[in-house]
Amino acid sequence: MAEACYERWEGRGALGYLTLAAICEGQLEDPPDAARLVVAHDCFPTGMLGYWGRRLADGGLVAALTATSPPRLGHPDGGPKLAGTNPLAIAIPSSDGKPIVSDVSWGRVTYGDVIAGIARDDELVPFGGEHAHKAFAMSLGLQLLVDALVGGGYGAVLLVARPEADPVPALRVRASDVRLPGDA
């Protein structure tokens, strides 16, 4: 289903990487006039969302992208696992060719770290110590946002837009020599 400001992609169980590759290519080939919401249903895993955000920002587009995964995070006080690590990536293009790309997962470790043997499954808890409720709240909010738009199964939601301004160069001047999100 596609309209000027909305697209729904059916992953049909495909790897999220492949689905997001096709979605990003589609947005770069036919960018929105202003903004577009893209919903991808039935695709998992999506991997590091900042990669896809950077591709869009390198193409001159603003992007906010989140995706769901199997429930791996419980409430910081204990109980059942209620949400995935549900990353959020935000990418802002820049006329200087160096976009800002923020990519955060809400778990102390990622599930990819567990699969790679770098971390243990019991380390999949909301990050933040005594403030872990904030990471849990964000993860749960993103889970429900995607669930509400996808309608069942795993998926991803992308907001992609043409920028109205170019804030990154001024930020880089103010930041001086500080490393910013997405810098190598």
Residue ranges and their predicted role:
Residues 9-11, 36-42, 63-67, 92, ...:
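General beta-strand structural signal in soluble alpha/beta enzymes
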Residues 71-123:
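Phosphate/diphosphate-binding glycine-rich loops and adjacent basic-rich segments that engage nucleotide
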Residues 60-72, 143-157:
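Glycine-rich phosphate/pyrophosphate-binding loops
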Residues 1-29:
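Active-site cofactor/substrate anionic-group-binding motifs, chiefly glycine-
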Residues 102-103, 108-151:
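Small-residue-enriched flexible segments
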Residues 153-184:
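Catalytic-core signal marking the mid-to-C-terminal active-site face
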Residues 25-66:
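A glycine-rich phosphate/pyrophosphate-binding beta-strand-loop-alpha-helix module
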